[in-house]
Structures are given as C-alpha cells and as structure tokens.
C-alpha cells in the first residue's frame, strides 16, 4: 500500500465525506450551526484541501490559500497518522479558531467514523443503514479515482480506460460517475444522467451494501442480475480492476 495514495484517499474521500455527512445527518448539521471557519490540510508531497464551514453548510475545496486554520504535515505518512489517531497536528495559523478544531471538528470525525465503520446493530435502523451506505458509495467512488491517479497498479489500469464517463449507480438511490480524460480519473458525485459511455448499476441499496462489505461476489452478482453493466465494457472492466484495490486502502 502506497502512503501517498492513502493520503489522497484520506483527504479527498474520508475527510471529503464530511460535507455530505453534514447535509444528511441532523447531529452533524447541528455541530456546524452558526460556525464560520475553514480548516486547511497541507500535506508535503501530497494533497492539499480545505473544509469550509459557513452558513450551516460545509464544502470541500482544493488548496489551502484561504483557510483560517492551517494544519501542515511534513509527509503523507504524518497526515495518515492524523486519520488513524497516531499524529496530533500543530496548526501554523488560526489559533483563535482552535476550539472548533478540538471540539466540533473532532465530534464530526467521530460521527463520520460511526457511519463509515458502523456497529452491526446500528445498521438495523433503516435510516442509519441508508445514510451509511450512501456515504460509503461516494467514498468508494472518490477513492477509486484517487487510486487510479496515484497508485502504481491503479495507474496501470487507468492507462487502459478510454476517455468518457463510467456511471456508477444504486437502483432507486444515488448515482455518480468516474470521468476519464487522458487516463486521469475524476470522481463526479452528481448523477450524470445519460451522459456516460458505460454504466455499472447495483440492483438496490442492499446489494450495494453487501458488495461494499464483501458479503457477496461482484462477478457472481453480475451473473445473478444483481449488478447490471452496459456500454463500453472495457471501461467497466478496468474500473473494476481499480475497484479491487479500494479494499486494500480502506481496511
């Protein structure tokens, strides 16, 4: 597993899930009410992005030029330590906003962990199950793009993906797309509608969850009609090769 690739996943896919968490979970939304602060994560030889909290909403933007609180990391490994709890960052600016980082932001990340690594009992609640699965869906789509751009094996597979969009969807639920341009992948978290060259659709949210958790086999699910693929099959095939790498980074 490559530390730099993991850093891109941890920032763009894991922390990048916080805006959606704040949108979907009332408890998260309450934590950012009335807050006006932005937290920048600046990883040397790695990614840089800012979480912006304003007007009761959260957004994720590239770069750290306009952040209030800046958290620098000397290497991808140090940043990955933030996610696994082995690194305590020291901000280089924004000390007056540090209270939000220590209290509200920590509670947000704990809440996110509850949804991304849920207890089995929690998944028995239909609302929690749906929210958790949708968060996982978008996280996996983003992680797939990051692996295709940074992981050596992922880049090899991305090298065979022709320009276009692979729509990834859950029947009766969300849809997103992996867009390829000159073998660089971008995760588009909006429903592409009919703007795609190939498609992979999970039958329903329960099938998607079983696949995400590794409880059912993807190839067998295609044969059983639980996963539908169409369009340029070579695109889907190479995306699935990258998808196989996702579990390595998210475990």
Task: Indicate residue ranges for each PLM-predicted region.
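Feature captures hydrophobic
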Residues: 1-251
């Amino acid at each position: 597993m490559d530390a730099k690739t993991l850093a891109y996943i941890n920032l763009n896919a894991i922390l990048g899930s916080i805006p959606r968490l704040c949108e979907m979970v009332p408890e998260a939304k309450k934590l950012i009410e009335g807050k006006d602060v932005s937290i920048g994560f600046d990883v040397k030889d790695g990614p840089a992005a800012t979480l912006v909290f304003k007007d009761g909403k959260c957004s994720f933007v590239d770069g750290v030029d306009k952040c209030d609180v800046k958290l620098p990391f000397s290497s991808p490994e140090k940043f990955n330590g933030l996610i696994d709890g082995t690194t305590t960052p020291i901000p280089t600016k924004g000390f007056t906003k540090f209270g939000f980082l220590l209290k509200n932001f920590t509670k947000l990340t704990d809440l996110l962990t509850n949804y991304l690594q849920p207890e089995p009992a929690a998944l028995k609640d239909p609302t929690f199950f749906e929210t958790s699965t949708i968060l996982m869906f978008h996280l996996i789509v983003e992680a797939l793009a990051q692996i295709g751009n940074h992981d050596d094996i992922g880049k090899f597979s991305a090298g065979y993906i022709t320009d276009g969009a692979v729509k990834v969807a859950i029947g009766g639920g969300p849809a997103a797309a992996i867009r390829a341009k000159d073998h660089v992948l971008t995760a588009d978290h909006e429903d592409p509608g009919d703007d795609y060259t190939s498609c992979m659709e999970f039958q329903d949210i329960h099938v998607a969850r079983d696949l995400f958790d590794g409880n059912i086999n993807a190839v067998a699910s295609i044969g059983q009609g639980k996963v539908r693929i169409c369009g340029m099959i070579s695109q889907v095939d190479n995306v699935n090769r990258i998808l196989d790498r996702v579990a390595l980074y998210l475990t």
